[in-house]
Amino acid sequence: MANRQKMSKTRDKKPDWQERVVQIRRVSKVVKGGKKLSFRAIVVIGNERGQVGVGIGKASDVINAVKKAAADGKKHVVEVPLTRSNSIPHPIDGIGGAARVIMRPSAEGTGVIAGGAVRTVLELAGVRNILAKQLGSNNPLNNARAAMNALSRLKTFSQFAKDRGVIAE
């Protein structure tokens, strides 16, 4: 029984999934005896083929915080529709806290023109040609959440046609 559980755990972790740490921050909690220090990690996980997730983890040491964040990221994976030129199908913007991210599709050969946490999210989602701008807050967590909010609301041409009751050719 224990051997089967080990095998299923190794099968879940596919080699094509990548994780990148966006931020590690030391945080403290004031308790009766003084300050209790812990670490908060923000990790982006993706397979570069249209699936990406952002996770947050807190622990008393950095390694466990990153592990928890990666596990949290796997729980919050979203599917991103990509075009033939590895861009997004249409312009969109997303909001996370006080951060706002505007994304626009771009032509082949443009590359990922974005900064900070948004760039990491887009690269691990598999987007190769895009223009993105961060507005408002420059907090990496809120910018990553804003990017995920935008990517989760993307639709393909056929999905728009289906929603409107039009037959797509």
From Swiss-Prot:
PROSITE patterns assigned: RIBOSOMAL_S5 (PS00585), S5_DSRBD (PS50881)
Keyword RNA-binding among UniProt keywords: yes
Any one GO molecular function term: structural constituent of ribosome
Alphabetical UniProt keywords: Cyanelle, Plastid, Ribonucleoprotein, Ribosomal protein, RNA-binding, rRNA-binding
GO biological process, one term: translation
Domain S5 DRBM span(s) in chain numbering: 17-80
Pfam families, A to Z: Ribosomal_S5, Ribosomal_S5_C
Segments forming a coiled coil: none
Location of the protein in the cell: Plastid, Cyanelle
Matches recorded under InterPro entries: Ribosomal_Su5_D2-typ_SF, Ribosomal_uS5, Ribosomal_uS5_bac-type, Ribosomal_uS5_C, Ribosomal_uS5_N, Ribosomal_uS5_N_CS, Ribsml_uS5_D2-typ_fold_subgr
Family annotation (NCBIfam families): rpsE_bact
HAMAP family in alphabetical order: Ribosomal_uS5_B
Family, as annotated: Belongs to the universal ribosomal protein uS5 family.
Domains: entry comment: The N-terminal domain interacts with the head of the 30S subunit; the C-terminal domain interacts with the body and contacts protein S4. The interaction surface between S4 and S5 is involved in control of translational fidelity.
Cited function: With S4 and S12 plays an important role in translational accuracy.
Name this protein carries in UniProt: Small ribosomal subunit protein uS5c
Organism: Cyanophora paradoxa
Gene name tied to this protein: rps5
